[in-house]
Amino acid sequence: DELGPERNQASMKLGQEYTTEAYDKIKQTAPDIRVKNISGNAYLYSSEAKTLRDVNAGNGYLSLTVELFGSYDSVQAFAQDCRSVTDAVQQCSAQPDELRITWSPENDPGQSLASGSLQNVEQYTLELEGIAQLDWTADQMAKQTEVQYLLDEENEETAESEAFSEESSELSE
């Protein structure tokens, strides 16, 4: 059927419902984790899908993005929290087809360069696809985490590309 206003509204409603449910589960099961932002999206294949369970039954695609807050000094520390977030999300009434967990430092990397202290010039992104990856250990999640280096403005654009490598993050005159 057409992507009519009815299906659109249902998608939005289920996306919001999913966001709220996931956030509540994270607060209950992992109260130490600081969530900066969370957004769930439901893409419905047909207007048959009325509940989150319907979406999981093959009537749509669910994705969830969780942005974390705080300071991580390693990918391992980030991955531990990703595991806790994933545990919480797995208790929701529906499972995400895609779970994306991200973290960026609060400080301005340029300032930490100027002050000579180089903490927090990395940002982390973990993308889990499909239900099998939701069962991964924190170690597997750490390996899957993409690390981007935020050393200067020029690098922020190249950080978008998959091919971004550590060597290109050296400062050029």
Give the ranges of each region predicted by the language model.
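Solvent-exposed, polar/charged alpha-helical surfaces in well-ordered, non-transmembrane soluble domains
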Residues: 20, 24, 28, 80-83, ...
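Short, non-transmembrane amphipathic alpha-helical segments
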Residues: 73-96
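Polar/charged, Gly/Pro-rich intrinsically disordered segments
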Residues: 21-23, 27-69, 94-173
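Soluble non-cytosolic domains of exported or imported proteins
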Residues: 12-20, 72-80
